[in-house]
From Swiss-Prot:
Protein name, as recorded: Histidine--tRNA ligase
InterPro entries per record: aa-tRNA-synth_II, aa-tRNA-synth_II/BPL/LPL, Anticodon-bd, Anticodon-bd_dom_sf, His-tRNA-ligase, HisRS-like_core, HisRS/HisZ, HisZ
Record's signal peptide: none
EC code: 6.1.1.21
Amino acid sequence: MSGLPDYLRRPPRGMRDWLPPQFYALRHMEETLSKVAEAFGYRRVETPVVEHFEVLAKKAGQEVVNEIYYFKDKAGRDLGLRFDMTVPIARVISYNLSLPRPIRWYYFTKVFRYDEPQHGRYREFYQFGIELIGSASPRADAEVLQVFTQALDAVGARSYIVKINDRRVVDKLLERLGVSAYRDVIYRALDKKLKLSREEVIKLMAEGGVSLDTAERIYDIAEEMSIEEAVNVITKLDSGLGSFYNKLLKYLEAAVSLDKFRFDMSIVRGLDYYTGMVFEAFAGEYKLAVGGGGRYDDLLELYSGVKMPALGFAIGVERLMEAVGLEGVEKPLDYYIYIFDDDAYPYAVAIAKRLRSAGYSVVVELGEKNLKEVFEYILKIGTRYLIIIGKKELEKGVVKIRDLQRREEFEKPFSEFYGTT
């Protein structure tokens, strides 16, 4: 038999298999990030991978709608795979309106986007994120940013920058320049500022109807600045927004280092449901954003009919793993038990039971390898101790133990071994 052709032996394009070292690295990320969220009082949720297409498309921009994995089920219903967790969580809240607010939820789960696969961009990928629902206070914005930075710190991200913007600020600026009618065109062009050249971004705005002079001015205004500088600029544009950001600045100063933050008007995010503050993080030399989020005060009302302020963030787990250099985590076996014949098998099983109940991982040889082959095998898979039980050991009532790290060998009585639990 020839088996499967090569292309069927691989996962579908844009998806990946997780072998043990990579999966344990993923588990490490899950445990570390979950611990951060739990420490801030967030509780974990999960939703179906499959959603009604109408739910997914209700507030997503056209670019995102085009990336939804869409299909009809056998009953002819229009369904799709979730592209993030914010929309499904908004749906969940819509029929759980009696939940006490603010609601603090977090997730670590798979999402799907039918995007063009490339470096750092998969069609199936993991996201970690939080949603804080039911608060319009700037303290909520400060809390979400604090969780965001603490999550990045916890996994070892270094030299990262969190770039903040506010769609209301950009809207005020466009109003001043008389180009509010071209808001969507300008947003989409600014969103590509990190990927395209100055000329290409300006061209996108001009092709959308913005005059060349105004497009150049918008591009130049959308330069990075410190949070302190941004507060002054925002206050001149709108005193109400200025008051909000003065409070946010005060709360952030009390919780985190402001050196980690920059204000950048080109950060407008790719999803159309954000209504206020938006932000993205860039770690070291890694070119792509490892995560981001913002405020979406109108989204919950679309699903529940109830006005409910909310904000949150999502981190692309694979991107963050790549940015911090976490490629794999080896998880060596604690004990491998080798026996020379079936007479020793009951002893091997008894010892294995005791060790497993004490929390150790134990494999008992299946009887298909000789001792030389076992050595080759356990060195490849990674093993701490080899336990050998042969005829001599049975007669003496002991096991022979080889410490493969220290390269030591010693004997231990059966009775003493059982006493480990």
